[in-house]
Amino acid sequence: MSDISDANKLKHRFRGYFPVVIDVETAGFNSQTDALLEIAVTLLKMDDEGLLGIDKTLHFNIEPFEGANLEPEALAFNGIDPTNPLRGAVSEKEAFLEIFKAVKKAQKASDCHRSIIVAHNAAFDHGFVSKAIERCDLKRSPFHPFATFDTATLAGLAIGHTVLAKACIMAGIPFDNKEAHSALYDTERTAELFCYIVNRWKHLGGWPLLAAGESEDTDGEE
């Protein structure tokens, strides 16, 4: 029983990694030249039964960094006006200092040793996050430098669809296309999808795995 209870702790679920769901809205596809305009970060928690759920979400509108490229097509797609004062935008550095603080606190509370980005088509979000951290010359990032959990891949395996909206609907998660392409909305739907996949795998008997000690005993008996 103690082995099962221990396996239900978040620190043991992903090899000591604390999953942090992130979505960004940008002014293009090039993380080196195009502006990061919006970011939302959803922190997760695990209950005593080992089920993953949403804890809280942070959200920031971001000021384009100096010299940033703003692709008109990208702005038309996400509907963001970077010059609108009502956005209440903050600098990349201010946003990431707050994100680091919240992530490290949650990571420590879960007794995890590092955080790992969860995102839909994660290479895109990870690239923009990593470049912004580099631009701000921030040290001791809580995030793994290259490993991620990509919900597009996970959804393709678990649900049979890779598009966020359709994967959510197939998983029974409401999705409003009118709200899509807002970092806040997309992050929370991505978090719900990730939790659904992880929890479904558990319900199907995929976790926890047979304890190493039990496996060794079985091998010895054979």
Curated annotation (Swiss-Prot):
Record site: Important for substrate binding and specificity: 29, 77, 124, 146
GO cellular component, one term: cytosol
Pfam families: RNase_T
Enzyme Commission number(s): 3.1.13.-
Record GO biological process: DNA replication proofreading; tRNA processing
SMART domains named in the record: EXOIII (SM00479)
Domain of life: Bacteria
Record's cofactor remark: Binds two Mg(2+) per subunit. The active form of the enzyme binds two Mg(2+) ions in its active site. The first Mg(2+) forms only one salt bridge with the protein.
Keywords: Exonuclease, Hydrolase, Magnesium, Metal-binding, Nuclease, tRNA processing
Catalytic site: 181
Function: Trims short 3' overhangs of a variety of RNA species, leaving a one or two nucleotide 3' overhang. Responsible for the end-turnover of tRNA: specifically removes the terminal AMP residue from uncharged tRNA (tRNA-C-C-A). Also appears to be involved in tRNA biosynthesis.
Similarity comment: Belongs to the RNase T family.
Name of protein: Ribonuclease T
Protein species of origin: Shewanella sp. (strain MR-4)
Phylogenetic classification of the source organism: Bacteria, Pseudomonadati, Pseudomonadota, Gammaproteobacteria, Alteromonadales
